Swiss-Prot record:
Residues 286-425 form the N-acetyltransferase domain. Pathway: Amino-acid biosynthesis; L-arginine biosynthesis; N(2)-acetyl-L-ornithine from L-glutamate: step 1/4. Belongs to the acetyltransferase family. ArgA subfamily. InterPro entries: AceGlu_kinase-like_sf, Acyl_CoA_acyltransferase, Asp/Glu/Uridylate_kinase, GNAT_dom, NAGS_kin, NH2A_AcTrfase. It comes from the Bacteria. Its EC number is 2.3.1.1. It comes from Pseudomonas paraeruginosa (strain DSM 24068 / PA7). One of its GO terms (cellular component) is cytoplasm. This is Amino-acid acetyltransferase.
Length: 432
């Protein structure tokens, strides 16, 4: 079976959940200049074709810099924010206008045998962002640099209802007719908040947020963000992360940070469980809870491959239904990705940890340790003093977590009588 068939099947729940939802996507000017820009446009068109309501916010920093350099003007910044005097504003207007036209042209393509064929998109925009001047800060006059005052929620809503892609540029207008240079990150964040968007998607050069060791941080809650901001300092990643967290605190369900350098990053982030970048969300991504009868089907999907490999003892649906209350599970977006069971042993103060399993895609996130801790917690709550485990493949994992080698003779009689000598499982025990 072709790989894309399985991919489509697994993506179908996401396709359904994204339909008719508003997504605000921010692409900085560096992303528009990158060779991957064409692929990003194709991904946005696909997302629109699948029913998402798209608001695209573009940046223009490198384009402005090149125009300043061409005129022999030196860029001025204060607190990492551009000071936009009158000559600079001319460069801003030139850069933003040219870039907007280039983006609209790319979204208007309808070439045969291309991802754009038959798309026939309508790109809409206008004076949808009202701005105000930042003014004077620490003695520095920002002139025509502004901040978002209001997003025309109703106007954008009507355009989205008409199935247009709304394109917002980093310019805002005042009621007195002035033009202000805005940060595209601020425009995107405010648009996502005011439109009550389902998602804010922020493109950056990096795959997402990287921790101190260079490893991708896949998921964060807003309350975890300040510690990372302190570590990142004044970097652009810090700016993106701060915008993502602010949006979530203000009601946006999920913010995503993905790379504009990686082909397909947006689709991988939105249509797979593992994602591709960093997700910031208020809601709990995963839930460790006790299993219920409705979880039997998911448990079977999780443990069946391990049963077929002989790692776990086979359990029929009937057995799982009967013993479901013994199980604790980790659920992620409706998928059971890990489980473990506790069986108190009759006529003893001991219990057996059984059927500990973690989905292969999630085996490096400490979920096995979380389940072990939950099982030990439950065992202590039942007044058990000893926890046994029987294993054929994972002896070292249990030894590293305080289990000591034991024997069949050490098992309570009620469990020893059921020991399968054909499997020849190793016995370990741990004092609680």
């Amino acid at each position: 079976m072709p790989d894309y068939v399985n991919w489509l099947r697994h993506a179908s729940p996401y396709i359904n959940s994204h339909r008719d939802r508003t997504f605000v996507v921010m692409l900085p000017g560096e992303g528009v200049e990158h060779p991957n820009f064409g692929n990003i446009v194709h991904d946005l068109v696909l997302l629109h074709s699948l029913g998402a309501r798209l608001v695209l916010v573009h940046g223009s920093r490198p384009q402005i810099e090149s125009r300043l350099a061409a005129r022999g003007l030196a860029p001025r910044y204060h607190r990492d924010l551009r000071v936009t005097d009158a000559p600079t504003l001319e460069c801003v207007i030139d850069a933003v206008g040219s870039l907007r036209i280039a983006i609209e042209a790319r979204l208007s393509m309808d070439m045969a045998a291309s991802p754009m064929q038959g798309a026939r998109l309508r790109v809409a925009g206008g004076n949808l962002v009202t701005a105000r001047p930042i003014g004077v800060v620490e003695g520095v006059d920002y002139h025509h640099t502004g901040e978002v005052r209001r997003i025309d929620r109703k106007g954008i809503g009507r355009l989205l209802d008409e199935r247009s892609i709304v394109l917002l540029s980093p310019l805002g207008y005042s009621p007195t007719g002035e033009i202000f240079n805005l940060a595209c990150e601020d425009v995107a964040m405010r648009a996502a908040i005011d439109l009550e968007a389902e998602k804010l998607i922020l493109y950056g050069a990096e795959q997402g947020l990287l921790d101190a060791s260079g490893k991708l941080v896949r998921e964060l809650r807003p309350q975890q963000v300040p510690a990372h901001l302190q570590r990142l300092g004044n970097s652009y990643q810090a700016e993106l992360l701060d915008a993502a967290a602010q949006a979530c605190r203000a009601g946006v369900k999920r913010s995503h940070i993905v790379s504009y350098t990686e082909d397909g990053a947006l689709l991988s982030e939105l249509f797979t469980r593992t994602g591709n970048g960093t997700l910031v969300a208020q809601e709990q991504f995963e839930q460790l809870r006790e299993a219920g009868i409705e979880d039997v089907g998911g448990l079977i999907e999780l443990i069946r491959p391990l049963e077929e490999q002989g790692i776990l003892v086979r359990r029929s649906r009937e057995v799982l239904e009967r013993e479901i209350e013994q199980f604790s599970i980790v659920e992620r977006e409706g998928l059971i990705i890990a489980c473990a069971a506790l069986y108190p042993i009759a006529d003893s103060e001991a219990g057996e940890l059984a059927c500990l399993a973690v989905n292969p895609e999630y085996r490096h996130g400490g979920r096995g340790d979380e389940l072990l801790e939950r099982i030990e917690e439950r065992a202590r709550g039942l007044g058990l003093k000893t926890l046994f485990v029987l294993t054929t493949r994972t002896a070292h994992w249990f030894r590293e977590r305080g289990f000591q080698p034991s024997s069949v003779e050490r098992l309570p009689a009620a469990r020893a009588s059921l020991y399968n000598f054909q499997r020849n499982s190793q016995v370990f025990e741990k004092s609680l």
